Structure formats: C-alpha cells, structure tokens
Amino acid sequence: MANRLKEKFVNEITPDLVKKFDYTSVMQVPKIEKIVLNMGVGDAVTNSKNLDEAVAELELISGQKPLVTKAKKSIAGFRLREGMSIGAKVTLRGERMYDFLDKLVNVSLPRVRDFRGVSSKAFDGRGNYTLGVREQLIFPEIDFDNVNRVRGLDIVIVTTANTDEESRELLAQFGMPFEK
C-alpha cells in the first residue's frame, strides 16, 4: 500500500505544479528528496547518558536508528575534544519520509504551544526548508513521563526544487502550515 501523501503528490500536486510553473515535462516537477532530523546534544560532553536518551528519542520519532555525530574540531572553551560524540541525526527517504512528513504536518505541528504557522523565511535559496522544533514533546511517540530533559531538534526538508518559490508551493500543497 502506497503512502497517502505519496499518492496525493502523484495524483494532485504534480498536475497542479505543472500548470502553475508551466513545466514541459512532469519530471521537472520538484519533489522531496529527503528529510534530515538532527539533534545536537551539547551536554553529552559531561554526561554521555544524555546522548543515549537523545538517540532513543530520535529513534522513536523517526522509526530508524540515528547516526551519532562527532565533533570535527577540539574547542577548549566548550571542553570539547575532536571525535567526541555530540549529537545524533537521521536521514529519512522514501516511505518513511512521507510517513514522517504526514505526521509532522497533521499531528505534531498543531501540538506546538500558541502555534501560528511555520516561518516562510526559512528557505536557503536553493529550495530546501529548515525548521527548528523547540521541544521533542510535540511528537506523539514521546511519552511525557519518560522525558528527563526537553530537547529541540532541527528538521531539514531537502527538495529538488531550483527556487524557494517552487519549494514553498510544493510544501504548501503537502499541507505545511506557513504563517500568513
């Protein structure tokens, strides 16, 4: 069974975007390539248990095992040595990517306190969108009682769009609630 958002993309969004941007071929229509979730755990330097908890939470949120990220350089001011584990990231593609986007747009974002829509200025100029989440508690898989520290995470949606305008339209069609 194909994902609901994937079917919507093929049957509704693609024809709409072809009409709106006058593409000559349906292959020119921008699509979502991947979604990267990144959780920086700066306090993992002093307590490595914090990193294990962050990895477990990221695994619950994404449905796949995160990659532990390591420091590239030593920074004495942060008591950081090169090669120390300081975060975790997950790259979602295919089915899991569409599942996550569906969950993000329809379940998680509406659970954010006094939510007025996501910023429409967070595009990078090449059609990719970055969204920062202040607390991981907005995701339904995270049990409030088992969380000992509120952590934020970065969500990067990488598209094949050439311009921010095309990318914004694509995400808006997927139901991303941009602020007015």
Swiss-Prot record:
Signal sequence residues: none
Record's superkingdom? Bacteria
UniProt keywords (A-Z) are:
Ribonucleoprotein, Ribosomal protein, RNA-binding, rRNA-binding, tRNA-binding
Q: Which InterPro entries match?
A: Ribosomal_uL5, Ribosomal_uL5_bac-type, Ribosomal_uL5_C, Ribosomal_uL5_CS, Ribosomal_uL5_dom_sf, Ribosomal_uL5_N
Is rRNA-binding a UniProt keyword of this protein? yes
The record's listing under Pfam families reads: Ribosomal_L5, Ribosomal_L5_C
Q: Is ATP-binding included in the keywords of this UniProt record? A: no
Under the GO molecular function aspect, what terms does this record hold?
rRNA binding; structural constituent of ribosome; tRNA binding
Which PROSITE patterns is this protein grouped with? Answer: RIBOSOMAL_L5
GO BP, one annotated term: translation
* GO CC, alphabetical: ribonucleoprotein complex; ribosome
Question: Which family is this sequence assigned to?
Answer: Belongs to the universal ribosomal protein uL5 family.
Q: What does this protein do?
A: This is one of the proteins that bind and probably mediate the attachment of the 5S RNA into the large ribosomal subunit, where it forms part of the central protuberance. In the 70S ribosome it contacts protein S13 of the 30S subunit (bridge B1b), connecting the 2 subunits; this bridge is implicated in subunit movement. Contacts the P site tRNA; the 5S rRNA and some of its associated proteins might help stabilize positioning of ribosome-bound tRNAs.
- Quaternary data: Part of the 50S ribosomal subunit; part of the 5S rRNA/L5/L18/L25 subcomplex. Contacts the 5S rRNA and the P site tRNA. Forms a bridge to the 30S subunit in the 70S ribosome.
Q: What is this protein called?
A: Large ribosomal subunit protein uL5
Q: Gene encoding this chain?
A: rplE
